[in-house]
Swiss-Prot record:
InterPro entries: Domain_X (IPR024937), Maturase_MatK (IPR002866), Maturase_MatK_N (IPR024942). This is Maturase K. The gene is matK. It is found in: Plastid, Chloroplast. Usually encoded in the trnK tRNA gene intron. Probably assists in splicing its own and other chloroplast group II introns. Keywords: Chloroplast, mRNA processing, Plastid, RNA-binding, tRNA processing. It comes from Spirodela intermedia.
Length: 510
């Protein structure tokens, strides 16, 4: 990041109003690739005088690429020129990819510098490495959700038009040429098909340049969640430290001020309704959970407020059906690969005082997490480990590997899933997943050696079972001291790890 500051000072483009000239700086593309552009001048149909810029970042080359992008429409109609037709047919995606990679670096610079300056203002930066773990979210839910009544399962609304993404950046970056270039790249090259679409998950990105689309989607989510910055300064113990630095509040507060002028009395009443000390909000990627100890009417007001705010003031299309309100005692919500619920457990205790005895009915609530076996089987079937019925099948694409590599790959997948699903309250579904992977491994090895599964399992013996079933027990035996509480009973309890920073690919397929 210090390199970014040096480059900005060197080029004299320290303010975010002058980002467009950075697109013509060679070091931007070096930073984007960590090496040269690896551009072959012959594929660009460039004249011989610039052929010396092969495998280098060239100001002249970038200028010509941007010029050709803007001239795309005229080149499409020039069907008589074979070289121009070649540009339209073959090099079109290459030009977009090259310029967009540089653009992704440029738009990140102001936000990166703002984050660095905000961290330097704090004398002590809190050490929150453990809070980065995905499992830390569940430990928070386990502590808080058992005392709440209602939960809203929210899918972040998707923009129906790419112009929305440009308008969001316009609130933060006042460099008009850069925004025009981004708008042109969107509409002329992607036509909205590779961006965030209703047919895909709300966090789907284009594969051409994931860095740029990750930045655009994060900007979009920050805009959606800006409602919480206005209504609540803090909503949980796991609040994000970088959220405030990445959010430009000027544009949002301008809208809220306009609302307050026109509907000041009603707006104050609305704010009073949402002052709920027991409201908790958690989000990961495109899905969020909002829970409250309030009434069902309060949750309906929140739902109405979200829909109206997104549609009327942020111009986001948000169907009310994407927000589901349910009572904890009768509902299980799917979040981060776990099926979570807060069931009510009723029990009766007989109490006796002197000669009188009576029954006391007690009600307890406990946050429970389980592995949803049906979606997991669907994910395993997509990865070709089993069929849709859950019957294990062989993995033909791995049959050419050595036996040790095959066992190691299956074992690694099994260990990763066991590690991620260690917080499950009931392990039966996890055991079934292990069984599918173990038998799929055996079928793959039997297919390779042209043998039967039964004969192969007999030849491998019990060591083959330990590779898939005993790894988690070995880890726990090293981590936890010997106590009177048996290890078998301990393994049945939910265990949350603080070293999981990403979801397993099989879980992420869901």
């Amino acid at each position: 990041m210090e390199e970014f500051k040096g480059y900005l000072q060197k080029g004299g483009f320290k303010q975010q109003h002058f980002l467009y000239p950075l697109l013509f700086q060679e070091y931007i593309y070096v930073l984007a690739h960590d090496h040269g552009l690896n551009v072959n001048a012959s594929t660009l149909n460039e004249p011989s005088e610039i052929s010396g810029y092969d495998n280098k970042s060239s100001l002249l080359l970038v200028k010509r690429l941007i010029t050709r992008i803007y001239q795309q429409n005229s080149l499409i109609h020039s069907v008589n020129d074979s070289n121009q037709n070649r540009f339209v047919g073959h090099n079109n995606n290459f030009y977009y990819k090259m310029i967009s990679e540089g653009f992704a670096i440029v738009v990140e610079i102001p936000f990166s510098l703002r984050l660095i300056s905000s961290l330097k203002e704090k004398k002590e930066i809190p050490k929150s490495q453990n809070l980065r773990s995905i499992h830390s979210i569940f430990s928070f839910l386990e502590d808080k959700f058992a005392h709440l009544n209602y939960v809203s399962d929210i899918l972040i609304p998707y923009p129906v038009h790419l112009e929305i993404l440009v308008q969001i950046l316009q609130c933060w970056i006042q460099d008009v040429p850069s925004l025009h270039l981004l708008r042109f790249l969107f509409h002329e090259y992607h036509n909205g098909n590779n961006c965030i679409t209703p047919k895909k998950s709300s966090y789907g990105f284009s594969k051409d340049n994931p860095r740029l689309y990750r930045f655009l989607y994060n900007s979009y989510v920050v805009e959606c969640e800006s409602i919480f910055v206005f209504l609540r300064k803090s909503s949980s113990y796991l609040q994000s430290t970088s959220f405030g630095t990445l959010l430009e509040r000027t544009y949002f507060y301008g809208k809220i001020k306009h609302i307050g002028v026109t509907h000041s009395n009603d707006f104050q009443k609305t704010l009073w309704l949402f002052k709920d000390p027991f409201m908790h909000y958690v989000r990961y990627q495109g899905k969020s959970i909002m829970a409250s100890k309030g009434t069902h009417l309060l949750m309906k007001k929140w739902k109405s407020y979200f829909v109206n705010l997104w549609q009327c003031h942020f111009h986001f299309w948000s169907q009310p059906s994407r927000i589901h309100i349910n009572q904890f005692s009768h509902f299980s919500f799917y979040f981060l690969g776990y099926l979570s619920s807060v069931p009510i457990n009723r029990s009766s205790v007989k109490s006796q005082m002197l000669e009188n005895s009576f029954l006391i009915d007690t009600v307890t609530k406990k946050f429970e997490t389980m592995v949803s076996i049906i979606p997991m089987i669907g994910s395993l079937s997509k990865a070709k480990f089993c069929n849709l019925s859950g019957n294990p099948i062989s993995k033909p694409v791995w049959a050419d590997l050595s036996d040790s590599d095959i066992i190691d790959r299956f074992g690694r997948i099994c260990r990763n899933l066991s590690h991620y699903y260690s917080g499950s309250s009931k392990k039966q579904s996890l055991y079934r997943i292990k069984y599918i992977l173990r038998l799929s491994c055996a079928r793959t090895l039997a297919r390779k050696h042209k043998s039967t599964v039964r004969a192969f399992l007999q030849r491998l013996g019990s060591e083959f079972l330990e590779e898939f079933f005993m790894e988690e027990e070995k880890v726990l035996s090293l981590m936890l001291p010997r106590t009177s509480y048996s290890l078998h009973k301990l393994y049945r309890e939910p265990i949350w790890y603080l070293d999981i920073i990403r979801i397993n690919d099989l879980v992420n397929h869901l």
